Curated annotation (Swiss-Prot):
Expressed in seedlings, root epidermis, leaves, flowers and siliques. Residues 209-241 are annotated as: Leucine repeat II (LRII). Residues 250-401 are annotated as: PFYRE. Keywords: Nucleus, Transcription, Transcription regulation. One of its GO terms (molecular function) is DNA-binding transcription factor activity. Belongs to the GRAS family. It is found in: Nucleus. This is Scarecrow-like protein 3.
Length: 482
């Protein structure tokens, strides 16, 4: 990974990322480096030195939080607050959001204090702001553009010759994807099909805006078109609301949605563990079950780490554990399989942020968000208010959820393509390799974006979008096995 470091004279120079350097160092004992140094001396550190120092502080702070040593965690947070900055260089900006997340996690350990501090704060669902931030992400990163292109290409190839097509969008928040599909269908030699799009979103206003844009474009192209809005959270969706009709060729598009079901699976697993203990208390580890029942299943193994400075051996990592045998994820995928789609295209974060311990998630998410912040650093000025909005309202909120939340509250449970492939395969789907033409178009799109650090890697017929060598997102296509 390569990062841009801005010198005092305002020019930029390319240097090794602090995380790249840090990854070659020993992780056995993260300690407070020069903990007695005056804060004013810390300000004089060179960018790379400061980046390394911030990483050590974050890991040390997280280690103290995990072990319950809150006084030491507070000391680390104080140093972090003097070095981290939401408008500084890449590592300072990342550290600012991880620092906030760790502090928030500490506050949550005192529910009374946490609730009292938040009692007078009102959360407003500003729909226009949410749409604006999603649009900024779409414009600043090529991720969604590539996802939409590959999804549309898979749909077009699956629907060749079909006269009635129904597309279900499980996150109907961005009309750009379907505007492009309308234009592509209009260019078919045999003419466009009758197209029906069902959009699922929890906010009515978002669906209304999408419907207006798509109906307007369909009328302009003279394509027979219907839009079916479904106002619902995905985890509350009843498949009957999708109104799938006999004779329609069905396609399903899921962009960054399936991972939200994993929180329900974790909640179900904790309840099942508690039930097994009630039925057979002598056969279950009492301490672990009690910890799970208090909403911290992922904390059940934190004590095992205290003698290893907060780092779990690789054999304990979440990626090596078997998939849950049942849950909301399986039920939802089974329900989609029951609709018999000709193709289902899934885009997900290709990261392992669903580790069972805080330290696992912190390390993995540090690397992922460092790559995402690097992407912005190479293209968008540091003073850009739009960049700050994306970092704070999108990435910052994801980081906070990954680090400070547990149990059902922790919804940003990103996992690797390998695990999603296992789940989808078990639900009765077979992989449809993305076509050579689709991959060629996607690579051309990346080249046209002017982001030299992006590349697309093919993995078992799927596309993995990377920044440098770091996988960020995956796109895979599936069809029902008979």
């Amino acid at each position: 990974m390569v990062a841009m470091f801005q010198e005092d004279n305002g020019t930029s120079s390319v240097a090794s990322s602090p995380l790249q350097v840090f990854s070659t160092m020993s992780l056995n004992r993260p300690t407070l480096l020069a903990s007695s140094s005056p804060f004013h001396c810390l300000k004089d550190l060179k960018p790379e030195e400061r980046g390394l120092y911030l990483i050590h502080l974050l890991l040390t702070c997280a280690n103290h939080v995990a072990s319950g040593s809150l006084q030491n965690a507070n000391a680390a947070l104080e140093q972090l607050s003097h070095l981290a900055s939401p408008d500084g260089d890449t590592m300072q900006r990342i550290a600012a959001y991880f620092t906030e997340a760790l502090a928030n996690r500490i506050l949550k350990s005192w529910p009374g204090l946490y609730k009292a501090l938040n009692a007078t704060q009102t959360r407003t669902n500003n729909v226009s702001e949410e749409i604006h931030v999603r649009r900024l992400f779409f414009e600043m990163f090529p991720i969604l553009k590539v996802s939409y292109l590959l999804t549309n290409r898979a749909i077009l190839e699956a629907m060749e010759g079909e006269k009635m097509v129904h597309v279900i969008d499980l996150d109907a928040s961005e009309p750009a994807q379907w505007l492009a599909l309308l234009q592509a269908f209009n260019s078919r030699p045999e003419g466009p099909p009758h197209l029906r799009i069902t959009g699922v979103h929890h906010q009515k206003e978002v669906l209304e805006q999408m419907a207006h844009r798509l109906i307007e474009e369909a009328e302009k192209l003279d394509i027979p078109f219907q839009f079916n809005p479904v106002v619902s959270r995905l985890d509350c969706l009843n498949v009957e609301q999708l109104r799938v009709k006999t004779g329609e060729a069905l396609a399903v598009s899921s962009v960054l949605q399936l991972h939200t079901f994993l929180a329900s699976d974790d909640d179900l697993m904790r309840k099942n563990c508690a039930l097994r203990f009630q039925n057979n208390p002598s056969g279950v580890d009492l301490q672990r079950v009690l910890m799970m029942s208090h909403g911290s299943a992922a904390e059940a193994r934190e004590n095992d780490m205290s003698n290893n400075n907060g780092y779990s051996p690789s054999g304990d990592s979440a990626s090596s554990l078997p998939l849950p045998s049942s849950g909301r994820t399986d039920s939802f995928l089974n329900a989609i399989w029951g609709l018999s789609p000709k193709v289902m295209v899934v885009t997900e974060q290709d990261s392992d942020h669903n580790g069972s311990t805080l330290m696992e998630r912190l390390l993995e998410s540090l690397y992922t968000y460092a790559a995402l912040f690097d992407c912005l650093e190479t293209k968008v000025p540091r003073t850009s208010q739009d960049r700050i909005k994306v970092e704070k309202m999108l990435f910052g909120e994801e980081i906070k959820n990954i680090i400070s939340c547990e149990g059902f509250e922790r919804r940003e449970r990103h996992e690797k393509l390998e695990k999603w492939s296992q789940r989808i395969d078990l639900a009765g789907f077979g992989n449809v390799p993305l076509s050579y033409y689709a991959m060629l178009q996607a690579r051309r799109l990346l080249q046209g974006c002017g982001f030299d650090g992006y590349r697309i890697k093919e993995e078992s017929g799927c596309a993995v979008i990377c920044w440098q060598d770091r996988p960020l997102y995956s796109v895979s296509a599936w069809r029902c096995r008979k």
